[in-house]
Amino acid sequence: MKQLIILIFLFNFMYAYEFKLNEKEISYINNSSKKTFILNRLKKYENMKTEIKDYELIRKLSHVNSFMNKIFPAHDISTKASIDYWATPKEFLIQGHGDCEDYAITKYFTLLEIGIPKEKLYFAVVDVKGERSSHMVLFYLENKKSTPLVLDNLSSKVIPLTQREKLIPRFAFNEIDSYKFTNQKFTEKVKINWGEENKWEKLLNRVYSLNE
């Protein structure tokens, strides 16, 4: 049992997240014509994390959601050569724009950094009634039987999924597992078919291993 506890601790330590700029990013910022704006945004981001560290859960979720949602939305096709590019939190905050995946990703890693357990956070791919394209949001769940709280770049409020009537979740995933969603609940474990490129594994490698 003692060995198991040590292994779990080491696993969690290896995959702990810390927002820390590397030399390449520092050089980019220093040479950017938007240096002042970038530094101001990053300073506010660090101040926000410090301020909310001891807040109760719902206030933490709401502050992170609100802070990120102030960043300018932009579709991949207008910002990147690759369609459906998933930016790291540092890319998102330095560039100052992104699409729904980028908001969800940065909220996820920010919440990890201030102590929210990763097993309680899930990325959810949803359909939005009246819209043709899929959308991504971040779910917070106390457990898999509870109603998710939704962090969405299209909404300033963090509210239960049952109150977001236009959202129809298809599946949800995190670093641990992935599930199909039926009738607003987790149902069965599924293996996601990412196609030619597993964007999720690639993102995790860039964040944890390459410090991008």
Predicted regions and their residues:
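Sec-dependent N-terminal signal peptides
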Residues: Q3-N12
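Structural motif marking the loop-to-transmembrane transition
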Residues: M1-K2, L57
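A structural boundary/capping signal
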Residues: A16-E212
